[in-house]
């Protein structure tokens, strides 16, 4: 065990934990004032439910002894055998239970990200059931495929440094499925974010926490971690700039929300690649990611007519997909000897492996998410009724208001 690495991972874990409250602010500022508490409750509920699920079965299903490359066994049920003694399969320099806690923060954040797609219209009780089932049936298997010892995508050689597939594609695609299943919100013409300073503050906390998310995925304070640190920042900066420039060109003015969404999109795009590419490649990945995610939010969503409330798919699904492809293009063993060279360094096979991983994640997530929400809806209506939606979910679902001084309802 290395004390320096252990302290480093303690700090990284706490930083990633901060991302979920940051996401609550980021999403909360974008919805109408009558739905801000219900939106933030989604993130905090994920912290509670997934923490318990992870301790009981989730960690074992994700990282436990392999079963046919598909999922972990329940040998580590209730953290049986998961102690402070390092597990060299994952890291020989930090306690095994610290690695478990670091990965828990990823598992918490992922279903919270999904909630942006169906904000303002999903019944809270249905959401709680969905979190538990989705984490168990979708997140845990995909995490094992990509990161677990023996997982089939790991054995294939697909690369995902910090969760492009595991976190962002799964959450973005699941969000799209739910947005389509629940249908559009009522009376949304002319609505606007109720508190953009919340969103800007949330974006700042996400940017800060993302250093723990990406850099901590090195699991050691080494040269790869420092490269991931640089790459994370430059990709966010480049994406924020290209999103703003895209807004300026297509909509006449750059906006504060555009800057925030652009930064987050760049952070998403660099997530799978941050420990495998050079800083200049990270700049390109972020810059292109900003343009692609802007296009998904302002053109793709309009063309197909789905109501992805806070653009979970546009930012996370598209950003994660681009990041996975970009890893297959820009990865180089000069940055990380444990990785592989991508297409631009003479190895077309890596790009093929990345595409297989992305395709498998899309297919599995779409099928399982639809099955889960369809099953829940059979027993419990997942969408609030029209009166509850008009009243606002803060009152109809939670019996409280964020702002007692205002009577405005839009």
Residues of each region from the PLM?
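Glycine- and aromatic-enriched membrane alpha-helices
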Residues: 1-410
């Amino acid at each position: 065990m290395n004390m320096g690495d252990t302290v480093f991972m303690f700090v990284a874990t706490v930083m990633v934990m901060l991302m979920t409250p940051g996401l609550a602010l980021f999403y909360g500022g974008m919805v109408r004032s009558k739905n801000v508490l219900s939106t933030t409750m989604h993130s905090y509920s994920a912290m509670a439910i997934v923490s318990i699920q992870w301790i009981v079965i989730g960690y074992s299903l994700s990282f436990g002894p392999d079963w046919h490359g598909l999922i972990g066994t329940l040998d580590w049920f209730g953290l049986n055998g998961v102690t402070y003694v390092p597990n060299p399969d994952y890291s020989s320099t930090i306690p095994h239970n610290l690695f478990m806690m670091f990965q828990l923060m990823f598992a918490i954040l992922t279903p919270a990200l999904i909630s942006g797609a169906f904000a303002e219209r999903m019944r809270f009780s249905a959401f709680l059931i969905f979190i538990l089932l989705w984490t168990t049936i979708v997140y845990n298997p995909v995490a094992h495929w990509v990161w677990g010892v023996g997982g089939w995508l790991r054995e294939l050689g697909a690369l995902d440094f910090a969760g492009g597939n595991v976190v962002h594609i799964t959450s973005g695609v699941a969000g799209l499925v739910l947005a389509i299943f629940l249908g559009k919100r009522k009376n949304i013409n002319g609505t606007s974010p109720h508190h953009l300073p919340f969103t800007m503050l949330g974006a700042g906390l996400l940017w800060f926490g993302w250093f723990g998310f990406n850099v901590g995925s090195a699991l050691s304070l080494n040269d790869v971690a420092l490269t991931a640190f640089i790459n994370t920042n430059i990709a966010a900066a480049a994406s924020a700039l290209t999103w703003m420039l895209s807004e300026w060109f297509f909509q006449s003015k750059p906006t504060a929300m555009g800057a925030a969404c652009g930064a987050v999109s760049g952070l998403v795009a660099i997530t799978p690649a941050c420990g495998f590419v050079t800083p200049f490649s990270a700049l390109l990945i972020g810059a292109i990611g900003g343009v692609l995610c802007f296009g998904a939010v302002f053109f793709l969503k309009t063309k197909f007519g789905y109501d992805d409330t806070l653009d979970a798919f546009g930012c996370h699904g598209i950003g994660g997909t681009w990041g996975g492809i970009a890893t297959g293009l820009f990865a180089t063993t000069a940055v990380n000897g444990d990785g592989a060279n991508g297409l631009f360094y003479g190895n077309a096979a890596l790009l093929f492996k990345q595409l297989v991983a992305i395709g498998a994640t899309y297919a599995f997530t779409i099928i399982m998410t639809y099955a889960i929400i369809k099953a829940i809806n059979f027993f419990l209506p997942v969408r609030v009724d029209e009166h509850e939606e008009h009243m606002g979910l803060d009152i109809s679902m939670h019996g409280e208001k964020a702002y007692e001084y205002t009577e405005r309802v839009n």
